[in-house]
Amino acid sequence: MGEASPPAPARRHLLVLLLLLSTLVIPSAAAPIHDADAQESSLGLTGLQSLLQGFSRLFLKGNLLRGIDSLFSAPMDFRGLPGNYHKEENQEHQLGNNTLSSHLQIDKMTDNKTGEVLISENVVASIQPAEGSFEGDLKVPRMEEKEALVPIQKATDSFHTELHPRVAFWIIKLPRRRSHQDALEGGHWLSEKRHRLQAIRDGLRKGTHKDVLEEGTESSSHSRLSPRKTHLLYILRPSRQL
């Protein structure tokens, strides 16, 4: 005789007990996954911070970093300027063997009909290494601060004027490094046999497709002389008040 199976109510109680146990086990098992996600996000922020610090050490080199902010103009009271104003100023600072140059341009234009005022402030800064230094082989990072044109409504009460924030950011042109393609062109990685095969292919193209050859030579010359892509780094600067 086989053993008797448990009655239906007992089976239902057993299933309910298993479901309760599963609800207790699943949250405890899912907790480490949440902690792992938080840990990965914190590692990502740490990596971004180290990347920015490495960039500063690589291109701004210590004492240059301390003198960069002096290139940008101090806050100016634009309301005290005339309705139409233009100013350009060039400055140079010597830091060690490097020369820091800045060009400041301020424009203020007033619409006599509407009373709106457009203000533009541009600062272009560059770092020029000394001649013969190792840094001279690289393109100098170019830093630019742009202040967006901000319309200011004509003030009806001189004692109650609103402050309008301005947008500012830095554009840093990253140094160009020699590409892998240029390095291969400078080496002797192509053999004589490959050169001969390429010459045969070019000769066949000349005999069969003259028009295609002309377009091909133009495209090949353009591809060889095509400029490299310029890489720019945009850094948002805290806005100032007018």
Swiss-Prot record:
Keywords noted in UniProt: Cytoplasmic vesicle, Glycoprotein, Secreted, Signal
A GO BP entry is: canonical Wnt signaling pathway
Posttranslational modification, per the record? Answer: N-glycosylated during spermatogenesis. Not N-glycosylated in mature sperm.
Give the comment on domains: Contains a N-terminal domain similar to that of the N-terminal section of DKK3.
Annotated glycosylation sites = 97, 112
Q: Where in the cell is it found?
A: Secreted; Cytoplasmic vesicle, Secretory vesicle, Acrosome
Q: Note the PANTHER family from the entry.
A: DICKKOPF-LIKE PROTEIN 1 (PTHR12113:SF7), DICKKOPF3-LIKE 3 (PTHR12113)
Provenance organism: Homo sapiens (Human)
Q: Could you tell me which CDD domains the record lists for this protein?
A: Dkkl1
**Primary localization class, coarse:** secreted
GO terms under cellular component: acrosomal vesicle; extracellular space
Give an example GO molecular function: receptor antagonist activity
Whom does it interact with, and what assembly results? Interacts with SLXL1; Co-localize in seminiferous tubules. Interacts with SLY.
Q: What is this protein called?
A: Dickkopf-like protein 1
Q: What does this protein do?
A: Involved in fertilization by facilitating sperm penetration of the zona pellucida. May promote spermatocyte apoptosis, thereby limiting sperm production. In adults, may reduce testosterone synthesis in Leydig cells. Is not essential either for development or fertility.
